[in-house]
């Protein structure tokens, strides 16, 4: 067959394979066009799960008659005109493919009117050349897109559609996602003539929490902690599930970048790492929105725009992690410290003035500001947060509101639940902590009191004397050796595995399957549990030494190492210790463990110290 240019309709149908996967993807493209047009209300009507009819009506700016013919053409868009525009794109659409692709696999009509037009116009494409016809019509300001009989001319694609109920579920799920980030828009969804969703526009935080409860459930809205912080051009807002509840509030896990819902491994890792020490064995729920300079993120890396690429990925990762970690720590301290101070009188006063999570009473004039209520032990951390970010993190349970603080009525879903006791909170918080690797060598207060630690220089070097020598012994060298020795002793019986809060998914390398099969017992011995699913390596459990490491980089490095050799216990212990040198993170703890070693072991480790030439200094600077 000779090379030939494809007919326009066939080319559009091929392109539709990426853009139009199912009715939900059609609605996604059309509604996003409505939002780009400045609509404040979007009405969605479908029949038979969207396979029979999809109709989107909005009150946006509309399309002029002159542009209507181009609207159904490929690569025609009003969103950008140069490569510089693409580097700073903030609109949902920008490729100019959606309408052309949808019209090639359905009977599509586009009716629109602008504010300065007297009459509306309707456009539709017909024939193999996809010629666009424009005729007069009656329509208010805005646009209506109607797609009938989806995949009517591509029966193979139509056979892949699921049941009407399943397709509706996908549509409903997508609408929830967009309704959470665009709370300023009024959305309605009608299925088979019946209104099934009605999300009214919100103007206040109280109204947004009502939408949050409507979409993600009452339980999540009651437990949610508000996140609101900014640093330079990065801003993170939203809600996360409180770590002090054993069961997941919902299966809500939405992350938005500049208003666009994305799935990103870097983001997932940052969230998982922030929740690591609060692990409940279930996945945390969250609705988070990241805003940043559009020049710092590339949204043109996925056909459906579900993925993005950050130019400074590590910076973004650390920012998200620190913001969430600080918020969770602040709430944890308030939950325990403040609850211990409550008595019967303060508890009764909390009902008069309004109260926030875990029984922390809030004055009537306060709104999401705990900066003056924090216990003394929390003050330093709060100040650190204020130095790190240009505005403090508002880590406040969502059911504290202006309405409550003014003594007014509140929605039923935000009524205060029975609070756990201080002892219950404290004991549960202790359970949430990552177990110590060796609790026997920690917290021995009596032994620590009897052991005198030598002077320490810059918090990193002990100053020792041995005969006529003055030595500098690095704390890190000793802490690393102690950890390596500890791991080595435990490897014979195998390390304890800890389940991850959220399993980590990594794209499979073709060489990993053989390595996983050959080293299965070894991986199990060091506490790593993985599975393979749909071309992805799913990391489910790791030893405590790897909990804070970058698993997306560490595990591939480990598999590459295991591919060529079977390391000894000493080598494995050294590798694990290298990825967790925080076991003896304080000099007193490290010295306490060091002092319990045999004398000959201590002597060998002291040989790693640096000798200071103090005699030559005295000769160079003699005393008068």
Swiss-Prot record:
GO terms for molecular function: ATP binding; ATP hydrolysis activity; ATP-dependent DNA damage sensor activity; mismatched DNA binding. The keyword DNA damage applies. Residues 372-383, 391-415 have a biased composition (Polar residues). InterPro entries: DNA_mismatch_repair_CS (IPR014762), DNA_mismatch_repair_MutL (IPR020667), DNA_mismatch_S5_2-like (IPR013507), HATPase_C_sf (IPR036890), MutL/Mlh/PMS (IPR002099), MutL/Mlh/Pms-like (IPR038973), MutL_C (IPR014790), MutL_C_dimsub (IPR042120). Transmembrane segments: none annotated. It comes from the Bacteria. Residues 340-355 have a biased composition (Basic and acidic residues). Keywords: DNA damage, DNA repair. Gene3D superfamilies: 3.30.230.10, Histidine kinase-like ATPase, C-terminal domain, MutL, C-terminal domain, dimerisation subdomain, MutL, C-terminal domain, regulatory subdomain. One of its GO terms (cellular component) is mismatch repair complex. The keyword DNA damage applies. GO terms for biological process: mismatch repair. Residues 340-415 are annotated as: Disordered. Belongs to the DNA mismatch repair MutL/HexB family. This protein is involved in the repair of mismatches in DNA. It is required for dam-dependent methyl-directed DNA mismatch repair. May act as a 'molecular matchmaker', a protein that promotes the formation of a stable complex between two or more DNA-binding proteins in an ATP-dependent manner without itself being part of a final effector complex. This is DNA mismatch repair protein MutL. It comes from Shewanella sediminis (strain HAW-EB3).
